[in-house]
Design a protein with these regions (language model features):
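Conserved SAM-binding loop
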Residues: 213-214
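Feature captures hydrophobic
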Residues: 1-153, 157-159, 165
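A short acidic, Gly/Pro-enriched loop at the edge of an enzyme's catalytic core
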Residues: 234-243
Length: 390
């Protein structure tokens, strides 16, 4: 056992939750049990350089090693859950190097969400092709967490539940003039138009989503109610009774969080309100997270950033809003991600024919399991929030 292996084991033995069974490159097994119950994870280390690279490269390197098949596990979600539960101890064990610190600063700067860069960042993820997403999302083409009212709810019903809860939270009524910031593939706008007889302006900066949503409203005969606009939220004009947004705030970027709420304040009618669904990160890990881009920010959502609840509250209160209500749904997101992951893999043969390779498959498996583990551990949470002007 070399120097790096000893450091690695010393750190793992301090983890308080679950167990980790390691298969070393020489074929020997070693199991480390923590004091408290948790997921039972397995990790196969393929070559002798892996541990050194994990310690020197941190969580992003860990992801890259999985994608390159130099670490292997029989249950990726269990491993991600194990890592997330023991996040505090992992941060203490695998200290950040000055090179990683400077590189992280560069990544944040490079992906800063200016109006031009925001389009590039969104395109990086959402313009992989509508057919790609069709193969593993539900029929409503909803790419955000569902809410399961009962254990027998299928994904499509649970997505409808989510729409209904946010509409109720936002007091949507017939005749409202609504702005949806980040409309995705149009599921929520269609739901509102059909169920509330509203006028909706649906914003997107994804070319693929703009095309799909425009065609969707034409097919549903809803063009008189839903106006799909290719526009950055910072450029929108008008006055709205309600401003709604589902999991778009995560793409705004920390430098523009205040701008987001300041802009909404200028377009919201005096008695209007705001309904948001968004992901938050635990306050206790926010400070480390905000300075160190993770796997998601490097490979999946460049320019993205999650707020903590306290940070979010401070920004909201400093922009003349107040939180009227807030609800949490972390377990629902974990279940949604689990379903997506299964559907992604079940349909991989079709996805592969679109031109995606094995590395892409492993990247997306890691992404979906990484997020599921985060929600299971409660390091990240899903919130539905209603805001009103003071």
């Amino acid at each position: 056992m070399n120097f790096w292996d000893k450091i690695f084991l010393k750190g793992i033995k301090k983890f308080p939750y679950g167990s980790l069974q390691i298969e070393w490159p020489d074929g020997k097994f070693q199991k480390i049990d923590a004091i408290h119950k948790g997921p039972n994870a397995k990790l196969k280390i393929v070559d002798s350089n892996v541990v050194r690279e994990i310690i020197q490269g941190g969580s992003i390197k860990f992801a890259e090693l999985y994608i390159s098949k130099r670490i292997i596990t029989n249950n990726l979600t269990n491993l991600m859950h194990y890592c997330a539960l023991n996040n505090d101890q992992a941060e203490e064990t695998f200290k950040i190097t000055i090179f990683r610190y400077l590189y992280n600063k560069y990544l944040h700067f490079k992906n800063k969400n200016t109006k031009i860069q925001a389009k590039k960042n969104i395109s990086h993820h959402y313009d992989l092709g509508n057919q790609f997403y069709k193969y593993w999302l539900d029929k409503s083409m909803t790419y955000s967490s569902a809410i399961f009212n009962g254990k027998n709810d299928n994904l499509e019903l649970a997505q409808n539940n989510k729409y209904q809860k946010l509409a109720d939270l936002s007091s949507i009524k017939k005749g409202d003039n609504i702005l949806e910031i980040g409309c995705g593939w149009g599921g929520f706008s269609e739901f509102l138009a059909k169920n509330y007889d509203c006028q909706i302006t649906a914003l997107t900066i994804s070319r693929e989503q703009f095309k799909f949503t425009t065609e969707r409203m034409e097919k549903a005969n809803l063009t008189s109610k839903v106006k799909v606009v290719f526009c950055d939220y910072r450029n929108i004009k008008g006055q709205f009774d309600k401003v709604l947004s589902i999991e778009m705030f995560e793409a705004v970027g920390r430098e523009y969080w205040k701008t987001f709420f300041e802009k909404i304040k200028t377009i919201l009618k005096p008695n209007g309100n705001v309904g948001l669904q968004l992901i938050t990160i635990d306050d206790k890990i926010y400070n480390v997270y905000k300075n160190n881009p993770d796997f998601i920010q490097k490979y999946i959502f460049p320019g993205g950033m999650l707020p903590s609840v306290e940070v979010l509250k401070n920004i909201i209160e400093n922009t003349s809003f107040r939180i009227n209500s807030i609800n949490s749904y972390s377990n629902d997101y974990a279940k949604t991600l689990n379903i997506w992951n299964k559907e992604f893999n079940r349909n991989w043969t079709k996805i592969e024919k679109l031109g995606f390779d094995e590395r892409f498959k492993l990247l997306w498996n890691y992404y979906l399991s990484y997020c599921e583990g985060g929600f299971l551990s409660k390091n990240i949470d899903l919130k539905q929030i209603n805001l009103k002007l003071n």
